[in-house]
Amino acid sequence: MNLVDSIARYSKGYDLPQNLVMAVAKVESNLSMHALRAEPAYRWMWNVETHKPFRRLNNPEVVSNEAPFDFPRPVEFFASNDTEWQGQRMSWGPFQMMGAVLRERRYKGPFPAICCDPDLASKFACSHLSRLRDRFYKKHGWAGVVAAYNSGTPRKTPDGVYTNVGYLNKVSISGAQKYLTFLRA
């Protein structure tokens, strides 16, 4: 199955607007399955043993390429703790999901598989978007859901503009105008 078909399948399965999901993938990667980006300052790591956020990182750990001694890795496949550390701090595949978010969504496989399997990428992105919808839609609408996809939570400036309005506008003009209207820079 190709990416477009996978997006159609999983957006329907998770009751998400297909155009919105497609627009997110267009903005994140231009629909490239092989998109990959290092995010070395990312600090919200996931503990795969407790299935909870990993402890707060100190400043040297945030910039380190090596995992702290107590950072666990999945036992389901062979990878070092350092590989897991780096993988959680990268965004993967057509939806550019952070490795830590993939672990939070209970993805247990090797991260590069997200860049090779459209169904896998679409399934986890739609699962994550549906979770964000369930948390934020009533109060913030689709703009808040998409803002949270990009930055973790929907955040606004004191004058009521989303802090990542530029991202929201890109998603809107990429095919989600129906869901993201009346935004301003």
Tell where the protein language model's regions lie, with residue ranges.
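General N-terminal targeting signals
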Residues: R37-A38, V48, I114, Y162
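Non-catalytic cell-wall polysaccharide-engagement segments
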Residues: M1-Y14, R55-A185
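Catalytic phosphate/metal-binding cores of nucleic-acid and nucleotide-processing enzymes, i.e., regions
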Residues: A23
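N-terminal export signals and maturation junctions of secreted/periplasmic proteins
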Residues: M1-G13, L31-M33, E39-R55
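Short, solvent-exposed loop/turn elements at domain surfaces
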Residues: M33-A35, R105-R106
